[in-house]
A protein has these predicted regions:
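Short alpha-helical segment that forms part of, or immediately flanks, the ligand-binding pocket
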Residues: 148, 171-173
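Short hydrophobic signal-anchor/transmembrane segments that target glycosyltransferases
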Residues: 5, 87, 99-114, 123-125
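Nucleotide-activated donor-binding/catalytic signature segment of Leloir-type glycosyltransferases, i.e.
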Residues: 122, 127-148, 156
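A short, active-site helix/loop in glycosyltransferases that binds the activated sugar's phosphate group
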Residues: 27-66
Length: 173
């Protein structure tokens, strides 16, 4: 997209923030694409050293002044809210996010601890898993506020990602 803007002669300074593996993203998959980004961007910001290292794979000139790591942050909790016996899973309901492991595990847990419940927030139309239990509640995709409200009720949040998670925002939340 940056190259498109440059070709259109857009006079602006570009700052890119990478929060996923750049080698899997259109416009930064190849060494030449990434070298063009270095040349044409004022700053490149990465959410972790891992993401930055991936970006520079195969590139000799690192341009340290243009490239920085800024870790995502949260506001510290001053008072922990009273929690319920709820285990939460939030995210896409697919294999890369580990939903297949969560689903089979949560059924065993809910069978053993009948006073616990689990909520699942998210969806995934491309993959279908059918985990059912009377204490397993699917909420679908919710707004950020509703998701955070449910997080505040849950005692446990599970993030079993199966891919190279550059910086799991779900775990941070």
């Amino acid at each position: 997209y940056i190259n498109y803007l440059i070709q259109k002669n857009i006079k602006s300074e570009f700052v890119l923030i990478f929060h996923n593996n750049p080698l899997n993203l259109g416009g930064s998959k190849t060494v030449s694409e990434r070298e063009e980004l270095i040349k044409n961007c004022k700053k490149l910001i990465f959410v972790s050293n891992w993401v930055k290292e991936k970006f520079f794979e195969g590139i000799d000139k690192k341009e340290p002044a243009k490239c920085i790591v800024i870790y995502p942050s949260i506001n510290p909790i001053k008072k922990f809210p009273k929690k319920k016996k709820i285990i939460a899973f939030v995210g896409k309901l697919n294999r890369s996010k580990g939903f297949h492991i969560f689903g089979s595990s949560i059924i065993k847990i809910l069978n053993k601890y009948s006073d616990w419940h689990s909520i699942v927030i998210g969806d995934e139309p491309r993959e279908k898993y059918n985990f059912n239990h009377k204490n397993l509640h699917y909420k679908g995709w919710l707004s950020h506020k509703k998701t955070m409200d449910l997080y505040n009720q849950a005692s446990i949040s599970v993030v079993p990602s199966f891919w190279e998670e550059p910086f799991g925002r779900t775990a941070m939340e």
